[in-house]
Amino acid sequence: FYVQYDATISEEVDSYLSGLEDERMRIQKRAENKGLAQSLNDLLNIVMSAGYEYIARMDADDISELNRFERQIQYFDEHPKVECLGTWAVEIMGDGGEYYRKQMPESHEDCKKLFRKRDCMIHPTVIFRRSYIEKSGLYSLDTYFGEDTMMWAQGFVAGCVFANVPEYLFRFRLDDNFFKRRRGWKHAKGIFTLRHKVNKMLHYGVMADFWALAYAGAKMMPICMLNVIYKTARK
């Protein structure tokens, strides 16, 4: 297990991590916050060099169900061509209360079809085969945000196979500022720029740019409306 944190963290968390007596744990510390994509790439370089076949990641405040890894590895064994595997997830608020049950398509074909409009994977639920990283490369450092979206695009271009386990194996936490961070002109512009680039990479055509424009436009709406759209547009 590799744990990385950038910049400063609370003394309580630092003390907890430092006190872990588990030889499987590797703590990576960095004084400067260089962003999620750089941190993920640093860890990918480490685990790829170590020769691991499967690579999983999650954020500190999310929760994996106890059988998550068992079910995903079993799915890999039953579907040897799959290289990027996610799951369904239950979105929870800061207090742990359920907000939304998020489903994703199971098959590769349906994943690629959905990707014309929006992401087809829930990032922290994903486990990669090492072959995925070997084919697609590391996370892009050239995006304002959406490093996961670009990672999926790189995988599709490289011919990688995607799938999702149709089970709720993960709880994804939404903090109080979740929608506030995902709206505004800068975010809307970044969304359209990213999705337009993805559409060109995958030759999705003009209709996909229409969806990108609609997606970006939603980011300019009031938070109360964005909350409603966030739920209804994904059904």
Walk through the language-model features, giving the residues of each:
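Nucleotide-sugar donor-binding/catalytic module of glycosyltransferases
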Residues: F1-G184
